[in-house]
């Protein structure tokens, strides 16, 4: 009886490990097939940080002056705008999606156990959507608007 139980447990563990391996392999293949998306996300990390911080003095730690925070925000915004300008016109929606993905990833990493603020997520999503116009980058008139989902399931 113990042997049967042991083999059943071993079979379950093997199936679970196989499923996890398949999932990891699928993600790896996806990134292999789309290396430009990973590169784009890396390029847009200043945008993700800018959006995540929302560059408000409310988020300023007590040991940083508001002037330092403003200067830091200006630098991040300039870096973000430079990176957005490097992205081809037809992929601006992808760029915005990448910024949103970065923001969501940062939130999951840093605030996994803290209360999630829906209004802050919406404000970040709106800021991410407006980054191209903040940078003075406007799509051509025949370009369709972007539709970006947020964590709360709201589309912009």
From Swiss-Prot:
Modified residues (Pyrrolidone carboxylic acid): 20
Cellular compartments per GO CC: aleurone grain; vacuole
SMART domains registered for this protein in UniProt: AAI
Pfam families: Gliadin (PF13016)
UniProt keyword Nucleotidyltransferase present: no
Subcellular localization(s) per the UniProt record: Vacuole, Aleurone grain
Transmembrane segments annotated in the record for this chain: none
GO MF terms, alphabetically ordered: nutrient reservoir activity
Presence of keyword ATP-binding: no
Main localisation: other
Residues spanning the signal sequence: 1-19
Family the entry assigns: Belongs to the prolamin family.
Record protein name field: Prolamin PPROL 17D
